[in-house]
């Protein structure tokens, strides 16, 4: 499973002119299920995201996670957006191939599982809309952008 995290001051997802998900300070999580992924990869990816220390402490060092933005338990938001294009392979030319992405039904199942687990473990979760044409608006904080990959064999 792959994800790209963007530390944001705020972010929102718009579908057909309507905002479907919105957060303040937190993480925009673009996520992609790959062929061979299962719940184990989703669990490992989510655990890493929730514990990743990419928010600044009082000294300006990246020592805080989305679960503890201020050292006193303030939690940031997660805006989770499905993005199968993270599985793009351009090694064979200039047109991306997406054969490494999970099949649409399996991708939706794993995305839904990932979101359900996030909702169970974190109080501030919003989402995009699976397989929709989305406009993602964000104010990148830093900028800080982190790619993550949990191997399907993991």
Curated annotation (Swiss-Prot):
One of its GO terms (molecular function) is Gly-tRNA(Ala) deacylase activity. It catalyses: glycyl-tRNA(Ala) + H2O = tRNA(Ala) + glycine + H(+); a D-aminoacyl-tRNA + H2O = a tRNA + a D-alpha-amino acid + H(+). It is an enzyme of class 3 (hydrolase). The keyword Cell cycle does not apply. Its main location: cytoplasm. One of its GO terms (biological process) is D-amino acid catabolic process. Keywords: Cytoplasm, Hydrolase, RNA-binding, tRNA-binding. One of its GO terms (cellular component) is cytoplasm. It comes from the Bacteria. A motif (Gly-cisPro motif, important for rejection of L-amino acids) lies at residues 142-143. It is found in: Cytoplasm. Its EC number is 3.1.1.96. InterPro entries: Daa-tRNA_deacyls_DTD, DTD-like_sf. The keyword Glycoprotein does not apply. Homodimer. Belongs to the DTD family. NCBIfam families: D-aminoacyl-tRNA deacylase. An aminoacyl-tRNA editing enzyme that deacylates mischarged D-aminoacyl-tRNAs. Also deacylates mischarged glycyl-tRNA(Ala), protecting cells against glycine mischarging by AlaRS. Acts via tRNA-based rather than protein-based catalysis; rejects L-amino acids rather than detecting D-amino acids in the active site. By recycling D-aminoacyl-tRNA to D-amino acids and free tRNA molecules, this enzyme counteracts the toxicity associated with the formation of D-aminoacyl-tRNA entities in vivo and helps enforce protein L-homochirality. A Gly-cisPro motif from one monomer fits into the active site of the other monomer to allow specific chiral rejection of L-amino acids. This is D-aminoacyl-tRNA deacylase. It comes from Polaromonas sp. (strain JS666 / ATCC BAA-500).
């Amino acid at each position: 499973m792959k994800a790209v995290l963007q530390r944001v001051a705020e972010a929102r997802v718009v579908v057909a002119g309507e905002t479907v998900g919105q957060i303040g300070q937190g993480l925009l999580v673009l996520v992609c299920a790959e062929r061979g992924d299962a719940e184990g990869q989703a669990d490992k990816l989510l655990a890493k995201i929730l514990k990743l220390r990419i928010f600044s402490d009082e000294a300006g060092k990246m020592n805080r996670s989305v679960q503890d933005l201020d050292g006193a338990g303030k939690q940031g938001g997660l805006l989770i957006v499905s993005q199968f294009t993270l599985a793009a392979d351009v090694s064979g030319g200039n047109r991306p191939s997406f054969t490494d992405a999970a099949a649409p039904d399996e991708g939706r199942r794993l995305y839904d599982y990932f979101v359900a687990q996030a909702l169970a473990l974190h109080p501030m979760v919003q989402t995009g809309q699976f397989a929709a044409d989305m406009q993602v608006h964000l104010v990148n904080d830093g900028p800080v952008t982190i790619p993550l990959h949990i191997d399907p064999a993991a």
